[in-house]
């Protein structure tokens, strides 16, 4: 019988047809995160993010945490609102940051650290301003490694640490933005 000889081909075509059919059905379920979405009150996620107020992050002035707090707040404000004008806020984002530096590798000859990891943990809660009710509580972290050059380069260690902090802030800001966008789309 001819079908026994071509059984492998027939099964492969049947599998391919099932996969393509399932992909076609699931394509109708796709919804872009930043597109217009009637389930978020008629506006887009970008509009909802623009309505989030980000107050100054509470830290002691003059500390390394103060610089990180300002950078994180600025990154989030730019991500949420860009250069657009002020919008009446519907939510408030309260953030607490705690940065740390962890020595990973020590030079066996000099005993000085040659590589460190800058760790940044940001805990945040989203509060609905009208009811003063916390609707979302979460935290995020970022670990960024950096090399420490030898003793001849006096300011290179500080510059490397600041660059690592800037990268960690961008990672944390992106994670917070994505989590809030997910909240505004799915409500969870």
Please state what every model-predicted region is.
Residues 64, 68, 114, 160, ...:
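Conserved acidic
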Residues 79-84, 128-130, 175-184:
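Sec/Tat-exported extracytoplasmic proteins
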Residues 2-20, 24-74, 185-188:
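A structural "domain/chain start" motif
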Residues 83-139, 143-163:
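Surface-exposed short loop/turn segments
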Residues 152-188:
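C-terminal/domain-edge helix-coil "capping" segments
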Residues 68-90:
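N-terminal, post-signal-peptide region of Sec/Tat-exported proteins
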Residues 5, 58, 80, 99-101:
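Short, well-ordered turn and helix-capping elements at secondary-structure junctions
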């Amino acid at each position: 019988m001819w079908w026994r000889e071509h059984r492998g081909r027939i099964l492969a075509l049947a599998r391919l047809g099932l996969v393509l059919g399932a992909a076609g059905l699931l394509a109708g379920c796709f919804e872009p995160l930043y597109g217009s979405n009637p389930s978020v009150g008629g506006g887009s996620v970008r509009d909802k993010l623009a309505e989030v107020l980000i107050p100054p992050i509470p830290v002691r002035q003059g500390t390394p945490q103060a610089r990180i707090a300002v950078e994180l707040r600025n990154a989030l404000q730019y991500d949420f609102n860009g250069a657009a004008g002020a919008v009446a806020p519907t939510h408030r984002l309260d953030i607490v940051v705690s940065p740390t530096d962890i020595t990973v590798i020590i030079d066996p000859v000099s005993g000085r650290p040659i590589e460190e990891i800058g760790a940044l943990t940001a805990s945040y809660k989203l509060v609905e301003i009208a009811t003063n009710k916390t609707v979302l509580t979460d935290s995020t972290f970022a670990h960024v490694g950096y090399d420490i050059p030898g003793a001849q380069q006096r300011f290179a260690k500080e510059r490397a640490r600041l660059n690592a902090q800037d990268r960690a802030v961008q990672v944390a800001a992106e994670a917070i933005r994505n989590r809030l966008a997910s909240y505004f789309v799915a409500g969870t």
